[in-house]
């Protein structure tokens, strides 16, 4: 059995999602958000993210961690803050000596929905379906679960099937 922690980093809200994988089947464990205080300096926000990820690592002992890669923001300051949040989340996971994999937003959407330009609500819907949840999790938690699901698919080669099927469809339309 593999426990995967998906992380959707953010300087204000960092989403997390935990799934377990056994015999190529996935199941929901937990999800939520690490919310940082508005009234503290960036360094303290980063410490809150670090502590939150470490707490999850200690409590659930995931064997693998997946995190979203940075995408370009229109605002360079936002991109830098996101990079800091992502960095401390990765350091927190690395301090527990687990494998960390990174995925682009397009890879995550392609793996979970089957379409790399899918909308957020489509991703959330598929997270609910794939994990057989009663309701959609919070936005950042749903994104983190999608990252964990993507990692499960990637490590089992399922994304290659999804990607090749999508390519064939595009070729047939030409």
Curated annotation (Swiss-Prot):
Gene3D superfamilies per the UniProt record, alphabetical: Ribonuclease H-like superfamily/Ribonuclease H
EC number per UniProt: 3.1.21.10
UniProt cross-references to InterPro entries, sorted A to Z: RNaseH-like_sf, RNaseH_sf, X-over_junc_endoDNase_Mg_BS, X-over_junc_endoDNase_RuvC
Matching Pfam families: RuvC
GO MF entries: crossover junction DNA endonuclease activity; DNA binding; magnesium ion binding
Keyword annotations from UniProtKB, A to Z: Cytoplasm, DNA damage, DNA recombination, DNA repair, DNA-binding, Endonuclease, Hydrolase, Magnesium, Metal-binding, Nuclease
UniProt KW Glycoprotein keyword: no
Active site: 8, 68, 140
Subunit structure: Homodimer which binds Holliday junction (HJ) DNA. The HJ becomes 2-fold symmetrical on binding to RuvC with unstacked arms; it has a different conformation from HJ DNA in complex with RuvA. In the full resolvosome a probable DNA-RuvA(4)-RuvB(12)-RuvC(2) complex forms which resolves the HJ.
Name of the protein described by the UniProt record: Crossover junction endodeoxyribonuclease RuvC
Organism of derivation: Legionella pneumophila (strain Lens)
Gene: ruvC
